[in-house]
């Protein structure tokens, strides 16, 4: 009987710990403010906003973006005692999504659903996530940025020039990209995966311990790693490639016509293809 009671207690503790681990906490401004714990009564609220071309998420909200014609829309689904603590507004052509100042909250679910005809900028500062539900097509340049531990995911991007960056421990995972010039940068311990890319020119840099993986095709590519990070582009076919490593990081690339390599430190550059080489041997 005692063993059974102990087993039941253990199971209850496991479920309790799991439930707690699913909660998110956010505090802005005064940490001494009383924490608002989300209720179990969930509501949906439509928020009227002006036109915007950029989305900026601060803090921990999760955002789903859908590209569609018509007026822009914002719909929030969360607990009834949390919803009025959000600060959602359009300023300088940017939709800002976050919490009001001096807020201390604990919640389990906060979904923000956003729709607009066009975007040219997407950014996350904090631990929030953005999901591009049906991709994004624009004739403009497009900037995608994560600063912090948040994530941006999606598939089906078509734009002019594209700039994608991670600063911190966040992740960006986007598939099926068509653009003119692609610029990729990872600073910190974050990771980036871009699959099935079609680009004219590509520039990719890693600073720190993060990594980036790119697949697809490009005409020219310039790669650099400073630190212990890794750049995996052996599945990204390029005609002409320049690759440099400073530190202990690594680059794996794919060049068909020409490859220039420079290394400083213990880092390495590996390649596939049969290009003309400018690859001085270390003395």
Q: Language-model segments: which ranges?
A:
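Intrinsically disordered, low-complexity terminal regions
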Residues: 1-283
């Amino acid at each position: 009987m005692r063993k059974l009671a102990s087993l039941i207690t253990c199971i209850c503790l496991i479920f309790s710990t799991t439930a707690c681990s699913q909660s998110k906490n956010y505090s802005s401004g005064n940490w001494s403010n009383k924490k608002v714990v989300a209720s179990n009564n969930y509501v949906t609220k439509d928020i009227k906003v002006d036109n915007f071309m950029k989305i900026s998420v601060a803090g921990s909200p999760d955002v789903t973006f859908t590209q569609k014609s018509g007026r822009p829309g914002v719909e929030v689904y969360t607990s009834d005692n949390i919803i009025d603590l959000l600060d959602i507004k359009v300023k300088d052509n940017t939709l800002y999504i976050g919490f009001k100042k001096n807020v201390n909250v604990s919640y389990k679910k906060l979904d923000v659903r956003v729709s607009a005809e066009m975007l040219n900028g997407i950014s996350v500062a904090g631990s929030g996530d953005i999901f591009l539900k049906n991709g994004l097509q624009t004739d403009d340049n497009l900037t995608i940025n994560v600063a912090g531990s948040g994530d941006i995911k999606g598939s089906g991007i078509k734009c002019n020039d594209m700039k994608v960056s991670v600063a911190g421990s966040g992740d960006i995972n986007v598939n099926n990209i068509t653009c003119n010039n692609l610029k990729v940068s990872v600073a910190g311990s974050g990771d980036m995966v871009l699959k099935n890319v079609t680009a004219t020119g590509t520039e990719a840099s890693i600073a720190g311990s993060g990594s980036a993986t790119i697949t697809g095709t490009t005409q020219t590519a310039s790669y650099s790693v400073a630190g212990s990070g890794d750049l995996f582009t052996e599945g990204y076919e390029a005609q002409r490639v320049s690759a440099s490593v400073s530190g202990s990081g690594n680059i794996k690339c794919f060049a068909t016509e020409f490859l220039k390599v420079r290394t400083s430190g213990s880092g390495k550059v590996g390649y596939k293809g049969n290009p003309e080489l400018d690859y001085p041997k270390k003395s």
